[in-house]
Amino acid sequence: MDKLIMESQLPKFTREPEKYSRLRLLEALQELYLSIEMLKEGYTRNSASKLFLSWKALMSSLVVSNFNKIIEKKKKEGKEDDIKWYLRIGYSAPTTGLMGIARDLEDLGFKGLVTLTTAMLGIHKYAYNGLDEDISPFHSRKDAIIALKELIKSEIDIVNVNSLDEEEKELLEKIKKEFDKL
């Protein structure tokens, strides 16, 4: 696993969309692997943080690989502001735009992304706030672990249906193997 992928400059998504999307997918896989490793070591909040970063990278990859379809749909709907937003920052799947992105991707045929994004935002809250009963969606460590495992599995399933290159396939197999140890 090339650890420098997550640390390197990404190409402009408008110039090299396929490369950008592939790098974000690889980043998603690397973060997912780290989430599993953190969970195995008992660091649930760190695992949650990595899982959320993985989800954002995966969503960015999906947006860029489906960018033309999203923009075409927005043009038909007359949503010029949405088009500008996707060109300016939406392609990167910012946290504040994840729900809208999930809806747009579901409109293209991706199933369950709104529900998963809602759950991932809960994981994000847990990563920052821990078991604070006034803020966190989880009130026990056990509940957080159950949710983390379910969401990791869901993300694995989503990645599994994508066409992957050899490096991505190898990393996904490694992820599945480590997940089975949880």
Give, region by region, the residue ranges found by the protein language model:
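Long, charged low-complexity segments
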Residues: 68-182
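Long amphipathic alpha-helical segments with strong coiled-coil/leucine-zipper propensity
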Residues: 40, 50, 71-72
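Solenoid-repeat scaffolds in large eukaryotic assemblies
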Residues: 47-48, 54
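Charged alpha-helical initiation segments
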Residues: 1-44
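Amphipathic alpha-helix face/heptad-repeat signature
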Residues: 24, 50-51, 116, 144
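Short, charge-rich amphipathic alpha-helical segments embedded
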Residues: 55-73
